[in-house]
């Protein structure tokens, strides 16, 4: 009977150790995926910011061009 208990314990132990190792690897993989998601979110945020800056500069450029055009017309007349 003691032999069966030891065998059962050994089987359970050998079954749980790989399970534990697999779960650790799975957690590490999930953490890496979350880090990659965070980095891609930061890149998207930066892209949105740059897009907004570009639109703002375009608007300012139009205003400056209009004002410069008015100054040139006033100087001719």
Curated annotation (Swiss-Prot):
Q: Which cysteines are joined by disulfide bonds?
A: none
Location of this chain's protein in the cell: Secreted
Question: What Gene Ontology terms for biological process does this UniProt record contain?
Answer: defense response to bacterium
Q: Which residues carry this modification: Lysine amide?
A: 76
Highest rank taxon of the organism: Eukaryota
One GO term describing the cellular component? extracellular region
Q: Which residues form the propeptide?
A: 23-42
Q: Which UniProt keywords apply?
A: Amidation, Amphibian defense peptide, Antibiotic, Antimicrobial, Cleavage on pair of basic residues, Secreted, Signal
**Extent of the signal sequence:** 1-22
Q: Which tissues does it occur in?
A: Expressed by the skin glands.
In the record, the note on similarity to other proteins reads: Belongs to the frog skin active peptide (FSAP) family. Dermatoxin subfamily.
Function of the molecule: Possesses a potent antimicrobial activity against Gram-positive and Gram-negative bacteria. Probably acts by disturbing membrane functions with its amphipathic structure.
Q: What is this protein called?
A: Dermatoxin-DA1
Which organism encodes this protein?
Agalychnis dacnicolor (Giant Mexican leaf frog)
């Amino acid at each position: 009977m003691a032999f069966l208990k030891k065998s059962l314990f050994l089987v359970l132990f050998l079954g749980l150790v790989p399970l534990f190792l697999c779960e650790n690897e799975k957690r590490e993989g999930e953490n890496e995926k979350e880090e990659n998601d965070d980095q891609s979110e930061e890149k998207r945020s930066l892209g949105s910011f740059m897009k907004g800056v570009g639109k703002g500069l375009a608007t300012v450029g139009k205003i400056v061009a209009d004002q410069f055009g008015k100054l040139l017309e006033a100087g001719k007349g």
